[in-house]
Amino acid sequence: QDWFHGRCVTVPRLLSSQRPGFTSSPLLAWWEWDTKFLCPLCMRSRRPRLETILALLVALQRLPVRLPEGEALQCLTERAISWQGRARQVLASEEVTALLGRLAELRQRLQAESKPEESLAYSSDAGEGAGHIPKVQGLLENGDSVTSPEKVATEEGSGKRDLELLSSLLPQLTGPVLEL
């Protein structure tokens, strides 16, 4: 069971009689609740920055008394700083930079392969009647193309090649495995 601050999270409206027009079902599904599952004051983005905490620790060291909360804060801050250092060290290692470079090459190659197909799609659609709306293939922010179900069937071979190439690079990764 999850616990939230009572003042931060609203109680769900469970009876459908409170909703106009929906009298057929007695209860609402969980995705229809008018609730927040994370307390807004406890969300990660509201946590203080490390610089702010370090300034607080410096101010705490000037006090003539020792506070257990200050010592706990210092311990947590040291852990965070050491974790950041280890993460930077791993990300700067030759193995990770080589793999990131290889992934960038693969992304560029995939984008280069998709560009001629897009130009063909534009030119073939342009010759059709004025009443026909051309199907334009969009691009996502990261540059990946949005494909239609028809194109997925034609590109299965290249997708399998890329998957095999990426899976061959997986054994080179070192460190603990995180399950998402």
From Swiss-Prot:
Tell me the segments the record calls region Disordered: 116-159
Organism per entry:
Cricetulus griseus
State which Enzyme Commission number(s) the record gives. Answer: 1.14.11.67
Tell me, in one coarse class, where this protein mainly resides: nucleus
Q: Does the keyword Phosphoprotein apply?
A: yes
Q: Which Gene3D superfamilies match?
A: Zinc/RING finger domain, C3HC4 (zinc finger)
**What catalytic activity is recorded?**
N(6),N(6),N(6)-trimethyl-L-lysyl(4)-[histone H3] + 3 2-oxoglutarate + 3 O2 = L-lysyl(4)-[histone H3] + 3 formaldehyde + 3 succinate + 3 CO2
Q: Name one GO biological process term.
A: negative regulation of DNA-templated transcription
What's this protein's name?
Lysine-specific demethylase 5C
Keyword Ubl conjugation set for record: no
GO MF, one annotated term: metal ion binding
**What cofactor does this one take?**
Fe(2+)
